[in-house]
Design a protein with these regions (language model features):
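Glycine-rich, positively charged N-terminal anion/phosphate-binding segment
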Residues: 1-3, 17-92
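Membrane-interfacial amphipathic/re-entrant helices at transmembrane-helix boundaries
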Residues: 6-7
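Extreme N-terminal starter segment of soluble prokaryotic enzymes
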Residues: 10-11
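An anion-binding catalytic pocket shared by soluble metabolic enzymes
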Residues: 14
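Conserved small/polar residues in nucleotide/adenosyl-binding loops
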Residues: 99-106
Length: 106
């Protein structure tokens, strides 16, 4: 399977799961055959605020490739900044952007 020029050499891909797909879980899944790993959903606003706990969600294990970071939010400017932060802090091959409707909390 290919995502653009990125080749995934396994038919198994890890789905993003909030509170589950931390770096240790992703490494176990890769060792068991997952050919593609992805972080849990990460808030673009938390990345834009450089929240330490949120930045820790970007951690990768050595050799974690191909790998993706999944970011959600409703502010296009913050989403763009968060994508850049994710690339700088993670080394991910793919950044998935999930745009949401603005809510009263935004």
């Amino acid at each position: 399977m290919n995502i653009g020029t990125l080749t995934i050499n396994s038919s198994l891909a890890l789905a993003p799961m909030a509170g589950v797909t931390d770096v240790a879980f992703r490494q176990i899944c890769a060792e068991l055959g997952a050919g593609y790993t992805i972080t849990e959903l990460i808030s673009s606003k938390a990345l834009c605020y450089h929240d330490k706990k949120t930045l820790s969600l970007l951690q990768q294990f050595p050799g974690e490739h191909p790998a993706a970071v999944q970011i959600f939010g409703s502010d296009p400017i913050c989403m763009a900044e968060a994508a850049q932060i994710a690339l700088e802090h993670s080394g991910a091959d793919v950044v998935c952007l999930l745009y949401t409707s603005p809510s009263p909390r935004d």
